[in-house]
């Protein structure tokens, strides 16, 4: 969710997730990822942007993404109001992801400016 939000905000030149959901938005403390995406969607569309699509690539060994890929794509797409694709890969046992210590996500967003 963080990578998705950062990608959309960056593509719109509207800052990043820290700027948008910073300490000045205490109402978002503890909010679900879906609530964050919906608030982001409403904000960028109010600015006149159209979110065309978002691509997420998850890098890590665990958890396995494929069994729930379709579910993730459907839930994220519904919240964003635009197609979200999810791909997964490993880092061939290299680095912190290869040691199973975490994952990272690369996100790209295509938006149409007003």
Locations of regions flagged by a protein language model:
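RNase III-family endoribonuclease catalytic core
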Residues: 1-75
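A generic local secondary-structure boundary/capping motif
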Residues: 46-47, 94-98
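Structural preference for beta-strand elements that scaffold enzyme active sites
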Residues: 55, 83-85
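Short, active-site-adjacent cap segments at secondary-structure transitions
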Residues: 64-66, 92-95
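Beta-rich strand-turn-strand
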Residues: 78-82
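Pyridoxal 5′-phosphate
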Residues: 86-90
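C-terminal edge-of-domain segments
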Residues: 97-114
């Amino acid at each position: 969710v963080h990578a998705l939000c950062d990608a959309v905000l960056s593509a719109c030149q509207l800052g990043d997730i820290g700027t948008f959901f910073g300490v000045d938005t205490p109402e978002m403390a503890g909010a679900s990822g879906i609530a964050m995406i919906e608030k982001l969607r409403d904000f960028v569309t109010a600015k006149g942007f159209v979110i065309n699509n978002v691509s997420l690539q998850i890098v890590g060994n665990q958890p396995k993404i494929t069994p729930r890929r379709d579910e993730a794509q459907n839930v994220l797409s519904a919240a964003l109001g635009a197609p979200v694709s999810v791909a997964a890969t490993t880092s061939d046992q290299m680095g912190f992801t290869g040691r199973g210590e975490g994952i990272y996500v690369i996100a790209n967003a295509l938006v149409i400016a007003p």
